[in-house]
UniProtKB/Swiss-Prot annotation:
It comes from Nematostella vectensis (Starlet sea anemone). The keyword Disulfide bond applies. This is Nematocyst expressed protein 3-like. Residues 59-91, 107-143, 149-183 form the ShKT domain. InterPro entries: ShKT_dom. Residues 235-313, 331-408 have a biased composition (Low complexity). Keywords: Disulfide bond, Nematocyst, Secreted, Signal, Toxin.
Length: 432
């Protein structure tokens, strides 16, 4: 038993030692770095300026793709390093620096030439500033041509020097030693540079400089003909003063606003005056207000549903019109039995053509729907017409029973039938 126990212990020890040796061999084996994105190993992806070139025609479009897109430089590090290092901004800066007396000022001394002559143009100075300051110093006017001397480290230095911004900010004075020296005679700008000078992050495009209004730039040095400027307009994220004309627009609209209601109030009283004139006229006047009826249809549409005609006359005309129709409605007993109180002005219109008793029932049937559809405008002049023919109202009661036999008989026939029913009922009772 002891021998078996010792054999097991030895086997376990051997297994443990072999496992440790395997782990050591794995740790010593070299690991190949896996670059998922450019941000993971940004320092390892930097390429020296001598070999930093674009080898593909589609690199410009490839470098402008957004960072979140799967086809961007960040998500395709192999293509960015091998084919498009310039457009993806992977070029390394290796220049000779000499510190001046001020610890925060760095003066770059290098040969002022264009290393990549084919790719250097005015647009590159602003679209890819890091690469342009190393490979396109002459095109971007960052130093004196063909001489080793101080060089600017920002492509906007020529613009800042021409307009006198060198002494307005320490960043401009420190990063633009050449152009600030060339344009030292230019007076200081009245205001500091309005746009942001330093980018918020490494891949943020620089805002294109725009000349201030009313300021002329200084003349260029004799060895430069044209200043580097982009061929397209500046970015829209820095708009001009568009808020100035905005307050003037509401002021112009506010002025005609009060005039509009005044213009509508003027023709309002003129309309009832025109209707008051044809009211006392012959039945020809009924044909004249026919076109005016559709205009009033919009107002009296809710009137028959609301039943009372007095609330309609109260808000539209003056308060004097409210008591006028009240006495006319009281003596008319037929108005209560009639379907609507609007029938009150109907007998007044019929009182004028008294001799024409024969066509009276036809006229009563025709204007009945018209009076219901447009009573609002005719109700206003009703009291005025009644006040004028006051003496003629005396013969009116004689014509009333002759002209209105039909409506009167219909109203009286109902109680007469009821009496007959009672008699018949009483007669039946007697027979029983």
């Amino acid at each position: 038993m002891r021998v078996v126990y010792l054999v097991l212990v030895v086997a376990v020890i051997i297994a443990i030692t072999e496992a440790k040796s395997v782990k050591k061999s794995k740790t010593r084996s070299p690991k190949h770095p896996r670059h998922r994105t450019l941000a993971d190993d940004y320092k390892l992806n930097r390429i020296s300026a001598k070999y930093c070139k674009d080898y593909d025609d589609s690199c410009k479009a490839f470098g402008k793709i957004a960072k979140k897109d799967k086809k961007s430089c960040f998500n395709n590090p192999d293509k960015a390093r091998m084919a498009c290092p310039v457009s993806c901004k992977l070029c390394d800066k290796k220049t000779f620096h000499k510190k001046s007396k001020l610890s925060d000022v760095v003066v770059v001394r290098a040969m002022c030439v264009d290393i990549e002559v084919d790719q250097c143009n005015p647009d590159v100075c602003y679209t890819n500033p890091d690469w342009a300051t190393e490979n396109c110093r002459k095109t971007c006017m960052l130093c004196k041509p063909d001489i080793r001397g101080p060089c600017d480290t920002d492509p906007r230095c020529p613009f800042w020097g021409q307009y006198g911004y060198c002494s307005t900010a320490t960043y401009i004075d420190n990063h633009c030693p050449y152009n600030c020296d060339v344009y030292s005679y230019v007076p200081e700008a009245p205001q500091p540079y309005p746009l942001p000078i330093e980018p918020l992050y490494a891949y943020q495009p620089l805002p294109y400089p725009t000349a201030p209004p009313g300021v002329t730039p200084a003349t260029l040095p004799p060895y430069y003909e044209n200043a580097p400027q982009p061929t397209y307009a500046p970015g829209a994220q820095y708009p001009a003063a568009t808020a100035a004309p905005a307050p003037s627009a509401p002021g112009a609209t506010a002025a005609p606003a009060p005039s509009a209601p005044g213009a509508t109030a003027a023709p309002a009283p003129s309309a009832p005056e025109a209707t008051a004139a044809p009211a006392p006229s012959a039945p020809e006047a009924t044909a004249a207000p026919a076109p005016s009826a559709p205009e009033a249809t919009a107002a009296p549409a809710p009137a028959p549903e609301a039943a009372p005609s007095e609330p309609e006359a109260a808000p539209a005309p003056a308060p004097e019109m409210a008591p006028a129709p009240a006495p006319e409605m009281a003596p008319a007993p037929e108005a209560a039995s009639a379907p609507a109180p609007e029938a009150a002005p109907a007998p007044e219109a019929a009182s004028a053509p008294a001799p024409e008793a024969a066509p009276a029932p036809e006229a009563a049937s025709a204007p009945a729907p018209e009076a219901a559809s447009a009573p609002a405008p005719e109700a206003a002049p009703a009291p005025e017409a009644a006040s004028a023919p006051a003496p003629e109202a005396a013969p009116a009661p004689e014509a009333a029973p002759s002209e209105q036999p039909m409506p009167g008989k219909k109203s009286k026939s109902k109680p007469s039938k009821r009496k007959g029913v009672k008699k018949s009922k009483s007669g039946h009772k007697r027979h029983h």
